[in-house]
UniProtKB/Swiss-Prot annotation:
UniProt entry keywords in alphabetical sequence: Cell inner membrane, Cell membrane, Membrane, Transmembrane, Transmembrane helix
CC per GO annotation: plasma membrane
Main location: membrane
Family: Belongs to the UPF0266 family.
Organism: Salmonella agona (strain SL483)
Membrane-related topology note: Multi-pass membrane protein
Name of the protein described by the UniProt record: UPF0266 membrane protein YobD
Keyword Cell membrane: yes
Highest taxon, organism lineage: Bacteria
A Pfam family it matches: DUF986
Length: 152
């Protein structure tokens, strides 16, 4: 096993740990989930570039008769990238004392101001940061509003 294979195993393990955390552990942290809303995906250009580069590496490894283990590891990396970028749905998860947005815990008392833009983006102003929450279904904004009013 080469150092390349070890690095690939490390990246695959990191992506797998992230996927498991995002899917199973994060919804169970900080109490029961009150509301979970699907968000719009960000630009997919980065993901196309990543999966494309891995596909080029697979092709290069196969045509140069590289190690079969490396080909399998690159394929697993491409599949993990495909899952994380295209199959997994980004979500905002509301709890009793705060919410998870982009895998970051934010307590409700950190929200200084909230606005709704004309194109349906909920803007939350924190102390030093602005969150742009783009929901997939525009009707979910009303659910978020009701939940925030109940918990304030």
């Amino acid at each position: 096993m080469t150092i390349t294979d070890l690095v690939l195993i490390l990246f695959i393990a990191a992506l797998l740990a992230y996927a498991l955390y995002d899917q199973f552990i994060m919804p169970r942290r900080n109490g029961p989930t009150l509301l979970s809303i699907a968000l719009l995906r960000r630009g997919r250009v980065d993901s196309v570039i990543f999966v494309g580069l891995v596909a080029i590496l697979i092709y290069n490894n196969v045509t140069s008769h590289g190690a079969q283990m490396t080909t399998w590891l690159l394929s697993a990396l491409a599949l993990m990238g495909f899952y994380i970028f295209w199959i997994r749905t980004p979500r905002i998860i509301f709890k009793q004392r705060g919410f998870f947005f982009a895998n970051v815990w934010i307590e409700y008392n950190r929200i200084k101001e909230m606005n709704l833009s004309e194109d349906g983006v909920l803007v939350m102003q924190l102390e030093q940061r602005r969150l742009l929450i783009r929901v997939r279904n525009i009707n979910d904004l009303e659910k978020i509003y009701k939940l925030l009013i109940e918990n304030q």
